[in-house]
Amino acid sequence: MMVHSPLATGPHPTTHLEPTMHQPHRSLLRKAFQMIPPLDGSLHKGQAGRIGIVGGSKDYTGAPFYSGYASLRLGSDLSHVICEPSASTVIKTYSPDLMVHSYLSSPKEPEAYASHQNQFEQLLDRLHVLVVGPGLGRDTEMQDWAEWTLKTAIQKKLHLVLDADALWLLVKKPDLLRGYPNAILTPNHVEFQRLLKACSIEPREHDDDGLLAMELSKALGGCSILQKGSIDLVAREGSEVAKVSCEGSPKRCGGQGDILSGLVGTWCAWTKLYFERQSQDEKPKSHELPISPEEAWIIAAVLGSEITRTCSRLAYHKFGRSMQSSDMLGYIGEAFEQVMHGHTKD
């Protein structure tokens, strides 16, 4: 009998299941091919995405691993985890593919704190996207680091994904993100209700149409909302609400949201890289479809959701009730192929 390691990430036997892409998304998601960095030998290391994960505290070390490693499995080149010193050694043992920085030190050690802030800020200049929240915790010092991170990243116009306890910070201080459109929030039901209350939005008992998520996007000044649930809803001010209803897994184990944040993060990096490539082209390619920035953010959120759900379904099909989030990691590549199956570059 084969026993899988708790952090097993290698490929599993191929599972033949039907593709998951849904007709309502096809016209939008066909454009996603244009956003994916080409694997044609023209790119250098890092040009397919440099991702930063801010989180990882003494009590929570798995979450940033899941987020960072998922981003690599989808196709980003480099994944940096920025965490508390006591968490760094543990996270390093999970995978040699992650670069782990113990910058989130205590202000009780002023010299080290100032040095780490400086090193962290220099690292931000090299990243395409920052995922804030996995394993962050609600400790005052970690929340202070998250606040500094958001303010600094916004000044640098970094693309952002906010999850978990970064959303707790946003509930307390919604003005931190207000008016900044280059961000995706990924709240679950409880986190979503807290955000509504923080923005003085009256909740409704039933909201399958995503209108509340749209109101939240408007209240925060145009960021994207990926509202997780039995059906994932993606809303952004000025765009139509997208619904992701493809089959996932009935097993709800810890870590799936962290995997989602890493996958969305990679798509956000690809969004940034796509528009950088477009600005460098002397004239647009005649065969390419036009993509607006608003569409690109919707694509990033929808595809992150679709791939996570498909990956979860594949893992559950193999492992059943015993499935853990670590089992999902080896299926990310196959899930990507299934989600994109049926689309053409023509």
Curated annotation (Swiss-Prot):
Entry keyword annotation includes NADP: yes
Localization, UniProt: Cytoplasm
Location of region: Disordered: 1-20
A Gene Ontology molecular function term of the record: ATP-dependent NAD(P)H-hydrate dehydratase activity
Binding-site positions, ATP: 228-232, 248-257
CDD domains: YXKO-related
One Pfam match: Carb_kinase
Membrane-spanning segments: none
Keyword Transferase part of the UniProt annotation: no
Cofactor(s) listed in the protein's UniProt record: Mg(2+)
A GO cellular component annotation in the UniProt record: cytoplasm
Residue intervals of the YjeF C-terminal domain: 28-339
Binding site for (6S)-NADPHX: 135, 188-194, 258
E.C. number(s) listed in UniProt: 4.2.1.93
Segments forming a coiled coil: none
InterPro entries: CARKD, Ribokinase-like
GO biological process entries: metabolite repair; nicotinamide nucleotide metabolic process
Gene3D superfamilies: 3.40.1190.20
Keywords: ATP-binding, Cytoplasm, Lyase, NAD, NADP, Nucleotide-binding, Phosphoprotein
Catalytic activity: (6S)-NADHX + ATP = ADP + phosphate + NADH + H(+); (6S)-NADPHX + ATP = ADP + phosphate + NADPH + H(+)
Function: Catalyzes the dehydration of the S-form of NAD(P)HX at the expense of ATP, which is converted to ADP. Together with NAD(P)HX epimerase, which catalyzes the epimerization of the S- and R-forms, the enzyme allows the repair of both epimers of NAD(P)HX, a damaged form of NAD(P)H that is a result of enzymatic or heat-dependent hydration.
Similarity annotation: Belongs to the NnrD/CARKD family.
Full protein name: ATP-dependent (S)-NAD(P)H-hydrate dehydratase 2
Taxon lineage: Eukaryota, Fungi, Dikarya, Basidiomycota, Pucciniomycotina
